[in-house]
Amino acid sequence: MQSVQGTQAMSDPTAVRPADKRAFLKWAVLGAVGIVNGYATILMYSRGEVAFALLTLILTTLALYIFGSRKTYAHRYIYPGIAGMILFILFPLAYTVGLAFTNYSAKNQLTLERAQSVLMDQTFQSGESYAFQLYKTEQGYRLLIEDGDERLATAPFSLSGNVPTDLNLEVIGGIDGEVEPIKTIIGYRTELSGIDLHFPDGEDIRMSGLRKFAAVKPLYTLQDDGETLTNNQSGQVLRPNMEIGFYQPINESGEFVGERVSPGFVVSIGTHNFERVWKDEGIKEPFINIFIWTVIFSVLTVIFTLMIGLVLASVVQWEALKGRAVYRVLLILPYAVPAFISILIFRGLFNQSFGEINMVLNGLFGLSPAWFSDPLLAKTMVLIVNTWLGFPYMMIFCMGLLKAIPDDLYEASAIDGANFIHNFTKITLPMMIKPLTPLLIASFAFNFNNFVMIQLLTQGGPNRIGTSEPAGYTDLLVSYTYRIAFEGTGGQDFGLASAIATLIFLLVGALALLNLRFTKLSQQ
């Protein structure tokens, strides 16, 4: 009986198979992903974020194709990695390079259309201003305007829901109601700003402050060409200057004259930001000095951490040393503590007035070094702290490499009468240098862009004098870029910072390639 029922169930065309359920669920999920991301793409594009809209479109299209087609089944396992690489590496890189060729800054953030709209919204007071009061009556709110000895008021209206945009003023003797405090006016400021009041003689006034209504007019009028603006107060004619990204007044011959008018807008300026790095002495000189210091800092950090790490790795693996496990744990602690905590602790220890290091030096030798004021001492302090943070990692790596070297080699060298120097130069170093090379290159690249270290310890200080942009003696290129982008004297200059970031990328890439090239030559 059960077999007959099973046969009938298998032959029933209305029965839903598990494979059909999985297919339906898959296409339902893919459809939902496509709809949500498609809607997000449209929103971003409509708001002018073309780059982010294109990124979302590419990632979504790839996901739908890879997970929806049987031909690309194997690619499903590598798609998360590819998407992450596009999202966190390629896109930021391309976006930064793109910004380097624009004037994008704190003063130039809008599009031309948006900047024009902001200017069109500006107004100026073209007539007398009048004090007002907001009354609350049983029928609603009323505005009272005082024109000399004359008192005029509006009809009752509502400030919630359907707020009127035009109200007539009539001469009255008084109002039965309570005067609203200033906090109520502040709360309804948006609604009150949209109301036009009309005097009996035809004069129109609008809210010009928390206590005043005045006759105001648009400051600019847009001409028929869709770009030219006329200043209704001064009569000046303005046009967008596409070379600097600002509206500027023009003379009768159409040449730009006078001061630029904010807000600015984003325009393409070609290689101007890169040219500033080499032509502006206020940027060129600190850039070259900071680049040299960055290379020295990275190289010395790698050398110091490797030397200390290798020596300590050899010591803690010395069989005659008792308590080696305890020493290993203690020496690894600097690596276990989060770097930002250690940096802030060292910042307190090196404090020139209250730091424990200066207290000890002053008590023993009568010295009180100016760690944060003297350029040489500041660089020394940075190297000391960075070496402290980096040697445990090198020590751990060297411990593993030393374990991999056969003891027979050292026994044979001992029979030949070799000392520890010959053992290190002829056995240890040659066998460790090949696996160490990628680590040393990675350590160099990391310290080349060690922003956290500089920002938390010295913030780039002490500052250099006579530079166009903020720059310090301990600044690395990456922290110098950050200061230009967010602490610039002339405002946040994201375009120039992006140009320097692009140069940093090219420099680090070139140095890494040179290191790899020299490594291959030395191995050959």
From Swiss-Prot:
The residue spans the entry assigns to the Periplasmic side of the membrane are as follows 46-49, 105-289, 348-379, 459-493
> Pfam families in the record, alphabetically?
BPD_transp_1 (PF00528), MalF_N_TM (PF20872), MalF_P2 (PF14785)
Localization, per the record, is: Cell inner membrane
Q: Which residues lie on this side of the membrane: Cytoplasmic?
A: 1-22, 70-81, 313-324, 403-435, 517-524
Q: Which GO terms describe its molecular function?
A: ABC-type maltose transporter activity
Membrane topology term reads: Multi-pass membrane protein
Q: Which PROSITE patterns match?
A: ABC_TM1
Q: Does the keyword Transmembrane helix apply?
A: yes
Q: How does it assemble?
A: The complex is composed of two ATP-binding proteins (MalK), two transmembrane proteins (MalG and MalF) and a solute-binding protein (MalE).
Q: What does this protein do?
A: Part of the ABC transporter complex MalEFGK involved in maltose/maltodextrin import. Probably responsible for the translocation of the substrate across the membrane.
- The identity of this protein, by name, is Maltose/maltodextrin transport system permease protein MalF
